Amino acid sequence: MGIRENEHRAANLRFNGKEIQLAVKMLDELETTIDIIYYLMEQEKEQSFVLMLLTAQGVDLNTLLNKEKRETDILFEIDKEESLYVMLCQDTKVDGGYRFAERVIRNIQLDEGKDIFCTELEVRATHYSAKHVILKLLETFVKSRLTDKSNEIVFRSLN
C-alpha cells in the first residue's frame, strides 16, 4: 500500500503527531529543571550546560548512561519503549559535552547497539526560555534523524 497524499510532510512542517507528543513529554520532564539551572546560572553558580538527547537500539541505554554520568548530571527517561533519554550536564561546555557523547557512543557500539542518534545543545545564557531550549533540542534531533546522521554527534550552541 502506498503513502496517502496527506501523509507526506510539508516542507514547513517540523513535527509530526508522534514528535509533538514527544515534545509534550520532554517539556513536562525538563522545563522545571532547566528553570532551576537558569536560576543557578543567574546566581553565577553555573556557567553553561549541555543537553544531550540520545537514542539507541539493542542496548540497555538507561544502565549505560547511569554508569557514565557524573554526580552533577541529571538523566531523564523520555520514552523507555523507544530507548530515548535526555542527559543534562551541568557546568559543561562544548568540549566536555562532545567528549562525553563520543565516549557514550563508543560504549554503545562496543555493546553492539545500533540506530544511534545523538544531539547535543550547549546553553550559555538564560535569555532563551526553557521551552525554546527543549524544542530546539528536539528540532535538531528530528532533523538529524531525517538526514540519517546515525552514529554522529550533532552539536549546536545557544548563546
Feature names for model-found ranges:
Residues 1-159:
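Regulatory and interdomain segments flanking nucleotide-handling catalytic cores
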